[in-house]
Each structure stands twice: as C-alpha cells, then as structure tokens.
Curated annotation (Swiss-Prot):
Keyword annotations: Nucleus, Ribonucleoprotein, Ribosome biogenesis, rRNA processing
A biological-process GO annotation: rRNA pseudouridine synthesis
Primary location recorded for the protein, binned into one broad class: nucleus
The protein's name: H/ACA ribonucleoprotein complex subunit 3
Family: Belongs to the NOP10 family.
Cell compartments where the protein resides: Nucleus, Nucleolus
InterPro entries from the UniProt entry: H/ACA_rnp_Nop10, H/ACA_rnp_Nop10_sf
GO terms for cellular component: box H/ACA snoRNP complex; sno(s)RNA-containing ribonucleoprotein complex
Transmembrane segments: none
Keyword check for Signal: no
GO MF annotation terms: RNA binding; snoRNA binding; telomerase RNA binding
Highest taxon above the source species: Eukaryota
Pfam family, one: Nop10p
Length: 64
C-alpha cells in the first residue's frame, strides 16, 4: 500500500490509499521519484535538452 492522491473538484489534493478516486479516475503516487547518484542517462538527457533548446543557458534571461 502506497500513499496516493487525486485532485477534487476544487483542485485540492486528497490523499488516499486507494488506486482510483471516487470518480473512477486513476490516482497519482504521492511519493517522489527515486534519485540515484549513479545517473546512467544524464549525458543523453543533457544532449536532448541541448538539441531542443531547453537548457537554462539557451533561454532568454529572466526579468525581475
């Protein structure tokens, strides 16, 4: 059993242990993804971000 959540009609998160909401929609995991120090795919992820212009250095500067 894992902690799950769904969004109610007001947009608020409702936490539950069930796999589907009362509206018969799938619930989402409330746990963050695992972080591994041994990141095998970081080189590929950076290459894809560079190719599609998604790196922060490729974005226009933020104005405050």
């Amino acid at each position: 059993m894992h902690l799950m959540y769904y969004n109610d009609k007001d947009g608020q998160r409702v936490y539950t242990l069930k796999k589907e909401s009362p509206n018969h929609e799938a619930t989402y995991s409330a746990h963050p993804a695992r972080f591994s120090v041994d990141d095998k795919y970081s080189r590929e992820r950076i290459a894809l971000k560079k190719r599609f212009g998604l790196l922060l250095t490729q974005q226009p500067p933020l104005e405050f």
